[in-house]
From Swiss-Prot:
Taxonomic lineage from the root: Eukaryota, Viridiplantae, Streptophyta, Embryophyta, Tracheophyta
Source organism: Albuca bracteata
Described function: Produces ATP from ADP in the presence of a proton gradient across the membrane. The catalytic sites are hosted primarily by the beta subunits.
Keyword terms: ATP synthesis, ATP-binding, CF(1), Chloroplast, Hydrogen ion transport, Ion transport, Membrane, Nucleotide-binding, Plastid, Thylakoid, Translocase, Transport
Main location: plastid
UniProt protein name: ATP synthase subunit beta, chloroplastic
Topology class, membrane: Peripheral membrane protein
The keyword Protein biosynthesis is assigned to this record: no
Gene3D superfamilies xrefs: 2.40.10.170, Bovine Mitochondrial F1-atpase, Atp Synthase Beta Chain, Chain D, domain 3, P-loop containing nucleotide triphosphate hydrolases
GO CC terms, sorted: chloroplast thylakoid membrane; mitochondrion; proton-transporting ATP synthase complex
Amino acid sequence: MRINPTTSGSAVSALEEKNLGRIAQIIGPVLDVVFPPGKMPNIYNALVVKGRDTVGQQINVTCEVQQLLGNNRVRAVAMSATDGLTRGMEVIDTGAPLSVPVGGATLGRIFNVLGEPVDNLGPVDTRTTSPIHRSAPAFIQLDTKLSIFETGIKVVDLLAPYRRGGKIGLFGGAGVGKTVLIMELINNIAKAHGGVSVFGGVGERTREGNDLYMEMKESGVINEKNIAESKVALVYGQMNEPPGARMRVGLTALTMAEYFRDVNEQDVLLFIDNIFRFVQAGSEVSALLGRMPSAVGYQPTLSTEMGSLQERITSTKEGSITSIQAVYVPADDLTDPAPATTFAHLDATTVLSRGLAAKGIYPAVDPLGSTSTMLQPRIVGEEHYEIAQRVKQTLQRYKELQDIIAILGLDELSEEDRLTVARARKIERFLSQPFFVAEVFTGSPGKYVGLAETIRGFQLILSGELDGLPEQAFYLVGNIDEATAKAMNLEGEKK
């Protein structure tokens, strides 16, 4: 990554030759600015509005140029609230896109979309900044190695394994556990993972951001006593932020992750919660920018915007970015343009099901709806592949039999089908697992289950060795030995 050195002399002369414009129109978060002829800023340049409002309060609003309208006008989207701005106010063209601090000094800190620290710990100790708009790495730089990323979550590791250096999507409607699953993945992976992580909070609840920060301090991922030893940088643009901030905060987080990958040559984890809010923010400003709405009211540039973000999240020969993204599914409709566009970019999808959440099976991951390009015998091995397929077949058969059971009852099934149903119900319960981050709600200590243990457990259920155990023994346990111990306890309680 090239960082152009600037001497103090040229910086002074650049300030003297400031390109000034004036606000001509304000429509919510969108501003029209008039510049002198021949002095038009480039698209994506940052503009700064400084001044005082009618009450004398200081105003400092950064905007990003989106369109050149002709007649010496540009249209820009504000990154913070436009309250107090008036027509005729002076606007400064910075002559460059938004740039944010990057490098080791960002670890342990919380930033907003502009790269300004918001954690009251003082300024960031770095001179190195990077623009948030960059092109994706060239095809020849990409790394194509295939390896599994173990998460310690049974349902994920067995049925839809994650790729190291890949892109993973967690799909689900409101309240089915996307953020809890992301927090568990941060807990299991970021703690064990030697490299660094970047968390981009895009348009989600402020409370969740605060909880995550507190939890990271408790677990030592953020080291309060020595911030430099922290392992994560946090970038937040919450629900209450204007759409401009929510639209760009994902790029700010990605820029920080890219620096660790390209310059420090590290393996980076990038968590984004929630990628749908990035699309939603784009659709909010799209109409104000004069674009005709497309399907379901989304912006016509949906695929382009998503592609420009996702194509930068990749692994190169220098280092890797493994990205885990939560994707809100409006009205539980996976064919909605926002989740449907996201699907195309992912190596693995973890689909959360409201039906399983209603049954109390957590994580509520749909074992039949979740997919992964990694579930191939040449990558995961014959044994893993075969057991995953048999688990899916058993669950699929159970799903087909549910209508018959509902109408005629279990007794009308053949002996073979009854056995399939009994094993499927055990598998369904064994796919649940107590989470470390949910200990407060469940009262059960969290469990990390290695891949070998997971495969052994499902092998035993499918082989019929555990047919005599009650199905409730398999609910919310870690490995299979805990299930057999729980069955003995249940037996003892009955006596």
